[in-house]
Amino acid sequence: MTRSLLAVGLALCVGVLLVSSSPTTAQPAAPPKAANADGELVGKVKDSIDKGVKYLKDTAAKNNGHWEGVVLKSLVDMDGGTTALAVLALLNSGEKVDSPTVKGGLDYLRKLTPAKTYVVALQTMALSEALILSRDKKDLPKIAKNVEWFEKNVIRRGGKLEGWSYPGNAIADNSNTQYALLGLYAAKTAGVKIEDKLWKDIQDYYTRTQKQDKLNPKAGYWLYHNAGGEGPSYTMSVGGACGLLIANMGLDMSEQDLNAATGVAAKCGIYPDNIALAKGMFYIGANFNFEQGKSYFYNYYGIERLGRLSGQRFIGKMDWYREGCEKLVKLQQPDGSFAYSSDAPGIDKGYPTITSSFALLYLSKGRTPVLVSKFAWGNYLKGEVGKQDQAILTERNPDGTITDAPNWNRKHSDCRNIVEFAQREIFDGAPLSWQVYDMRLQDLSTQAKIDSEVGLLLQSPLVYMNGHGSMPFVTRPTDTALSVPEQILKRYVEEGGFLLAEACCGNKDFAASFEELLARIFPGSALKKVPPEHAIWTMFPGIGPGDFPDLMYLDRGCRTVAIFSPRPLAGYWEERRFFPVDGRDPKNHGEKAFCLARNIIAYATGMELPKPKLTKTILVPPEKGGIARSKFRALQLKYISDASVQQPPASDALRNLMAYLGQHAKLDVALTSEVLPPSAVQLTKYKFMYLHGRKPITFTVEESDNIKANLQTGGLLLADAACNDIKQWKVFDQSFRDAMLKMFPDQKLVVIPTRTPDGKEEPLYKIASQAGINLGSVECRRENAEGTGAEKKLRTYPVMLEGIKIDGRWVVIYSRYDIGCAIEGHKSADCLGHDKESALRIASAIVLYSLRR
């Protein structure tokens, strides 16, 4: 067998000898994309994945259910490598484990006992992915056997780990080593026990073999062969940084020296790989380029792994997933495969199953919804302009010294671990990710850019903040203007986001800083202790208020928008030894800390999956200038006379509703609504009134008569019960019915039917249908069977609206299930109400009815 054939065969089995020459300088980041471009790219990526999946399925159907070819299967003894890669790509693209194509590929793999590192690794990864998705552990013995193979075939010299190679070859290489590590971690996630010593040896290996960049003291890289004299390898540097991240993730116990009783770490923020990882990330960011090495597609997959494992949205200054998607979709062929452009080199050129699988892994895994964003903050240095590191941020301490342990990131795996636990406990194993959110090098000089940034952050339903010391962006109480980070966090919460914060190691300076932040962005609001009746204690069993007596919360309008723990939690989240085997029966305080995170996430998300990455929320800008007399303008009734209430609940609901009507129904609307008490003499100017209720209604006779007069002269009142605990929800519901009975003694609220008594379509539904609004069914969370709370998940129901009719016209329309909080974007698993899309449809139909009638 010729050396060239061997090289091609091995490279095609995921990357042997994919070594780059000297890296090219990173290109400047592209200008921000327009809002419509974001939506277009989301659609393009989805279509591209669908076409790629079809291509792989069609290829397997023509090849007896697998993807092997003569070269890899017979000539280089790598049977199963291509099939495992294709199965992995299909599973990550949404194919079910029991689909005929995936089942056929898995059956093929189960018959094999591979003896090459790449194939053993890929077989392990494919079988582990299938096990996690199906929860069927039949392949666990085979996965465990593969772990034994890795442990047996690792190369050591003088007691030190040197990596993996091909059986019989005593010289290890970083490509084989990288895939051995991927296989080992996949096995661990599937449930195979791997001793911490092996992970520490791997950490030591990557730290020891990193080379110092002679051009930049802040950067370090890796080679393909540590014994060789070749230059830096970009692809192996990406693999080296991934190796450090994975080895740290594999450890059951970190080296932070955690006190399990208190949650305080004696060595908080100290990691043996801190410096090596920082140097590796610096090198990769400064030299970022997708078109590196002998296989660009292999490089795409490496970059995807690094971006996802590190949680970084930006590598250097490159928005890696967005930029990679834009490039990859252009490389897709009419048959759904992915191929190089005609003039591009590539050792895997002409092998579309390999290139297509790598492309799908990039597109699909990178698209994984972001559940939690970890908020980066603190002092920093920018790279020198004109130098290779101009796109890189260097962390520093408050005293100005450079640090590899920034105050916001003293725990490296806390966010990753709570997301993985929530994925298992709440979302039935659906793929989820986390990311670091770092705005510090972004150009946020205009309101439009700030709004765009908030729109991106909203793809993640939770923002997680923790650390040591005060956050420098929190301005003084005497400052009238909010800092840019304060503006972003305020708008994020107003648009439906949720804040989870924790004082790392119980740090009092951070606790005081976070409380000051909330006081700045929501004046008049204050953190309070979470009461025993709060829904987070009952989302899942296993914890109670006695376990976390100091836990704090902040309510705003419809619901709780922030949870803060002044006592340590992140130290437990950092270590997988506290990962509960049974989330309903935690054994110690560390396991209870994981269960608390689960319950908070369940509450904050309403147990709804986040939208895929790249999904951007377009914010409604504030209206500038005066309101034209011709514009339709809505009114919100503020019926609570309590002077401490600054605004009615769901105060942004009408703004979002008007923006929706302006876009979808082409109405000429005013985005700014009026807020008036029921007694206001101006009430008759507004023929659409909205009442969103949390507290019981007690209209005075004057207020009741004033509302009634408006209704009798063409007005319409839409009312709904806001998100609330079920006892308060029932109190409001009854108070509204009583108020309507006093207002209209001869009538009472009745269910609005879809048909009139003479069999015609009810005008409300007819007008909705004519406008293209489907009111046939909605997604709603109603009372549970016991009547003690809300259903755990949203369900599909017929629309449930009640009303009062005068002279053939509905003048009051009432939903006992929330509409306003949903339109604001709030999700809460204890809320009896609709999802946002359903709420917008219902409210839009009622507005159109009020205009047409």
Spell out what each predicted region is.
Residues 7-20:
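Bacterial N-terminal signal peptides
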Residues 18-30:
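Signal peptide processing junction and immediate N-terminal pro/mature segment
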Residues 27-51, 66-101, 112-148, 152-200, ...:
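An alpha-helical repeat/solenoid feature that recognizes helix-turn-helix modules
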Residues 56-82, 98-115, 440-451, 669-677:
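Internal amphipathic alpha-helical repeat/solenoid segments
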Residues 88, 123-125, 150-151, 177, ...:
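Structural recognition of the beta-strand scaffold that forms the well-ordered cores
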Residues 101, 424-521, 539, 565, ...:
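Helical hinge/lid and interdomain linker segments adjacent to catalytic or ligand-binding clefts
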Residues 368-462, 466-470, 569, 577-688, ...:
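Aromatic-Pro/Gly-enriched surface loop or interdomain linker
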Residues 506-599, 603, 613-616, 628-633, ...:
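An acidic, glycine-rich "communication" segment
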